[in-house]
Amino acid sequence: MTATTSATLTDGREARLRPLRCGDRERIVAAFDRLSEESRYRRFFAPLHQLSDRSLEYLTDIDHSDHEAIIALDPGTDELIGVARYVRGEPHGDRAEAAVVVADDWQHVGLGRALLERLVARARAEGISRFTAIVQADNRRALELLAEIGPTSRSLEGNLVELDIELPDERVGTALAAALRAAAGSIFGVRPLSERLLRAAHELSETRRSGP
């Protein structure tokens, strides 16, 4: 679970992958600050200018079982350049919500694929057999490729599709890897996670407003 591995990307660059650690809080903040407005919107489905303390606690306080996060680091700068995470729907259940985000200048080179492969392996090791994910409805290539794997899907609010993905027993198959490459600029499974983050930020704001 703590091992660091390397991934060679399609443009020849290398990335280091490992599970998130408690000391990565500042890396999370810095990575968020570097995201473009479009990437932030796709990740959180709402304009978000900064992460609240409560949001950061949620993102970094993980148990590596019901909540897991795999991060990618730039070997040259040690900056965080990508995160894939799952959150189990209920303790020890066999389903989890999944999300992937990649730094703007590391998109479309296979980093999302590498992160997802590692995340699926961790999920399988923890007894998770299915991921739910959210993809924008106009991301046709990703939807078509994911459908080849056998997910059921339904439209949400007209422009979003929820996917139910059966995880492979071993490494992510070629079709799923290709789907992630096709959607490298999109985020899988962000809506449920983003709603929790935005709710936490709103609650924190209300608490401060009503305080002394």
Predicted region positions:
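Long, contiguous binding/interaction regions
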Residues: 1-212
